[in-house]
UniProtKB/Swiss-Prot annotation:
Organism: Chloroflexus aggregans (strain MD-66 / DSM 9485)
Gene3D superfamilies: Ribosomal protein L17 (3.90.1030.10)
GO molecular function: structural constituent of ribosome
Highest classification ranks of the organism: Bacteria, Bacillati, Chloroflexota, Chloroflexia, Chloroflexales
The encoding gene: rplQ
BP GO terms, sorted: translation
Subunit structure: Part of the 50S ribosomal subunit. Contacts protein L32.
PANTHER family: LARGE RIBOSOMAL SUBUNIT PROTEIN BL17M, RIBOSOMAL PROTEIN L17
Full protein name: Large ribosomal subunit protein bL17
Statement: the UniProt record of this protein carries the keyword Membrane: no
Transmembrane segments: none
Family: Belongs to the bacterial ribosomal protein bL17 family.
């Protein structure tokens, strides 16, 4: 039984889930909004919020931490160019999830996650 186990498993192994989160975060940073399933959007939201909170203080340590999560120098640079200026005075709530309805092929609930 999974009593008292926090976090979404999304039917994937730890490594697969970590890669999924990394790819979703990179896509969100590069495109500002992405369309994905509601479960994936809800699972990646705390990860990207924490990453933006780290990026608000532009220090070498913060850059190393962000690079370890993202593994993409281009996405890390882009994050550190807009995060301190855009979210400098904002304490959390950097993303918004909007429900889009079911997907045509399999009926999965779709959502739009975007940076505010």
């Amino acid at each position: 039984m999974r009593h008292r186990h926090a976090g979404k498993l999304l039917g994937r192994s730890y490594e697969h889930r970590k890669a999924l989160y990394r790819n979703l975060m990179i896509a969100l940073i590069e495109h500002k909004k992405i369309k994905t399933t509601l479960a994936k959007a809800r699972a990646v939201q705390p990860e990207i919020e924490h990453l933006i909170s780290i990026a608000r203080e532009d220090t070498p340590h913060a850059r190393r931490m962000a690079l370890s999560k993202l593994a993409s120098k281009n996405a890390m640079r882009k994050l550190f160019t807009f995060a301190p200026t855009t979210y400098g005075g904002r304490n959390g709530g950097y993303t918004r999830i909007t429900k889009l309805g079911p997907r045509r092929g399999d009926g999965a609930e779709m959502a739009l996650i975007e940076l505010i």
